[in-house]
Amino acid sequence: MLMITSFANPRVAQAFVDYMATQGVILTIQQHNQSDVWLADESQAERVRAELARFLENPADPRYLAASWQSGHTDSGLHYRRYPFFAALRERAGPVTWVMMIACVVVFIAMQILGDQEVMLWLAWPFDPTLKFEFWRYFTHALMHFSLMHILFNLLWWWYLGGAVEKRLGSGKLIVITLISALLSGYVQQKFSGPWFGGLSGVVYALMGYVWLRGERDPQSGIYLQRGLIIFALIWIVAGWFDLFGMSMANGAHIAGLAVGLAMAFVDSLNARKRK
């Protein structure tokens, strides 16, 4: 048995399972925190993943609803309930995911009230040799964001990727990825631009690299990122490097974070194969 993906909404999971049944592929749903879709015949994995990518691009396509009717039902037998917005957030996010989101929001509010410079004096990467033993600074730069778009973009990806890692691999794994990527991406960025930078994007890029490569090399880990999204991440890095959008980006942190995530995923997937 091979786990293909997970859906927060069981109706969406059932729609995909029904469609694949019309294509001659039998999938099953197991209910845990989310609806996990499993494939018994692993020889069809590539075909199923290709169909999944098309499904995720437009799950509302009429052919998927038609497949449910063709399968003889539109009711999966599962008990559904409508999730309000915050309940949907809570469904995917574990405690570490939530703590980081809250910390970033609190710091952002403090920056609006006190000013960026005042907060950076306390949280920025050590900008003076006398501060090198204030160890929190090697990590707290990731909490600072300088615009509403900046924090929304990073927290959305953090929730999506960090939540998946925490739910599937545990809080400890998410903490390790976060600390290592914050430290190393911060170190590289301060070499590029000095100590005055901030944002969770180095960690987010680490999670992108980790989730994508771990999903490719170890599908049974239960985490997965579409190749199109990792391509988008690479394009964004190139755009930032050549300043195509006229925006100030932490290019060093992005590249270092992505490299950290890929390296950690490679090691973890090797260890997973050795245990089999």
Swiss-Prot record:
Disulfide-bond pairs as recorded: none
Reactions accelerated catalytically: Cleaves type-1 transmembrane domains using a catalytic dyad composed of serine and histidine that are contributed by different transmembrane domains
Superkingdom assignment: Bacteria
Stretches that traverse the bilayer: 94-114, 142-162, 169-189, 192-212, 229-249, 250-270
Membrane topology listed for this record: Multi-pass membrane protein
Protein's job: Rhomboid-type serine protease that catalyzes intramembrane proteolysis.
Family membership: Belongs to the peptidase S54 family.
Protein name (Swiss-Prot/TrEMBL): Rhomboid protease GlpG
Organism of origin: Escherichia coli O7:K1 (strain IAI39 / ExPEC)
